[in-house]
Regions:
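Short N-terminal strand-loop motif that marks the start
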Residues: 1-61, 121-131, 347-351
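Glycine-rich beta-strand-centered segment in the early N-terminal region that forms part
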Residues: 20-34, 47-93, 101, 137
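Short glycine-centered segments of the SAM/dcSAM-binding site in methyltransferase folds
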Residues: 80, 168, 260-261, 288
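NAD(P)H dinucleotide-binding glycine-rich loop of Rossmann-like/cofactor-binding domains
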Residues: 89-172
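Mid-domain Rossmann-like dinucleotide-binding core that forms the NAD(H)/NADP(H) cofactor-binding site
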Residues: 138-219
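Glycine-rich cofactor phosphate-binding loops and adjacent beta1-alpha1 units
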Residues: 161-162, 204, 209-286, 350-351
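Residues in the short beta-alpha loop(s) of Rossmann-like NAD(P)-binding domains
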Residues: 199, 268, 295
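C-terminal hydrophobic helical "lid"/dimerization subdomain
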Residues: 250-254, 296-351
Length: 351
């Protein structure tokens, strides 16, 4: 079969690889759609020490079970599925807390096991035993269901933000993750949702969503005053940083209202993770700061249920689809703000 194989920095090559074969307890999936994640882009541009080449990438997917050597699995041949991609291989305090994303005893699809930028993907036996495959029972499209994984990551952040009816929410970053945060905030009843970005093209796409303002980040910092003007001078009750940039983290502290909640959803590059922050904002405004990394299984379940409900506007997120052979075209589309979410269709041939 053809697969998109990561060979190292700036090397994602579509090449022939053997079809996967199953051991006892494993399941084989036929991949219908796999969305390109920001981490795929980051891995392509900068590499990732956790990924040992050669590795088939892709972890945001929708598929059908085509073979099973797991008679006790919660899914069967013919079922359409999505997958919680964190596989626990031990137990510690975090697993006991239901925070599988934080345990050191885990592996992940696309990092430690071959992923879904291919027509077929093998699901390891531990993932099958742990019930990581979720059967789709609605007629929602393959492309839309591929959003379950990134949406679950956003759910993880929202689980600790407590967004309510009187809250103003500011999201810094108008990429697909930022717009998922903005959409979730509105679904949770936020009275005002403000999105900020330094890319005008992204802000134009953001205006297609149910938000109150799309603000261009300015070098002189005037966007901060715009946030205050939109919030009667108070600032944002909840601020989510959905972009990997230290200035955005500082902006979040600046625009946060007193007693506000701030979530650093996006981390900084490991090569330069230190940010100069005015921590007096945290002290004097009594801010509550949280981080967010990956997702718990409960977050994925919540995202799965939301997509199933039809209440999430998945159609606004998938702006481009590509056959597997053209996967490398996704990266400049994402970087330039032309695309919001690019979905790769491994079963579609063509150039």
């Amino acid at each position: 079969m053809k697969a998109a194989v990561y060979l190292g920095k700036e090397q994602l090559v579509v090449q022939d690889v053997p079809d996967p074969t199953l051991a006892d307890g494993e399941v084989l999936l036929q991949i219908h759609a796999c969305s390109v994640c920001g981490t795929d882009l980051r891995t392509f541009r900068h590499g990732d020490k956790k990924i040992i080449p050669p590795r088939i990438l892709g972890h945001e997917f929708c598929a059908t079970v085509v073979e099973s050597r797991a008679p006790d699995a919660n899914v069967k041949v013919g079922d359409r599925v999505v997958m919680y991609i964190v596989i626990v291989d031990g137990r510690d305090r975090y697993v006991e807390m239901g925070r599988e994303n934080l345990t050191a005893h885990r592996t992940t699809m696309s990092y430690h096991h071959d992923g879904a930028f291919a027509p077929l993907m093998r699901v390891p036996a531990p993932a099958v035993r742990q019930g990581n495959l979720f059967k789709i029972t609605s007629n929602i499209s393959h492309e839309h269901m591929s959003l379950a994984e990134p949406l679950g990551c956003c759910m993880n952040a929202h689980s600790r933000l407590g967004i309510g009816l009187k809250d103003t929410v500011a999201v810094i970053g108008a990429g697909p993750i930022g717009m998922m945060h903005a959409t979730l905030a509105r679904l949770q009843g936020a009275q005002k949702v403000i999105v900020l970005d330094n890319n005008p093209a992204r802000l134009e796409m953001a205006k297609r969503f149910d938000i109150d303002a799309a603000l261009l980040v300015q070098a002189d910092g005037s966007h901060r005053e715009q946030v205050r003007a939109l919030t009667e001078g108070f600032g944002s009750d909840v601020t989510i940083v959905a972009v990997s940039a230290a200035p955005a983290q500082n902006d979040a502290l600046e625009i946060a209202a007193k007693a506000g909640r701030v979530n650093f959803f996006a981390g900084l590059p490991k090569s330069n993770p230190i940010a100069p922050l005015d921590v007096n904002h945290i002290h004097y405004k009594e801010l509550v700061i949280s981080g967010s990394y990956s997702e718990k299984k409960s977050d994925f379940q919540a995202a799965f249920a939301l997509l199933h409900s039809g209440r999430f506007p998945a159609d606004k997120f998938i702006t481009h689809t590509l056959p597997l052979e053209r996967i490398n075209e996704a990266f400049p589309l994402m970087e330039n703000g032309v695309a919001l979410k690019v979905c790769v269709l491994p079963l579609v041939n063509g150039h």
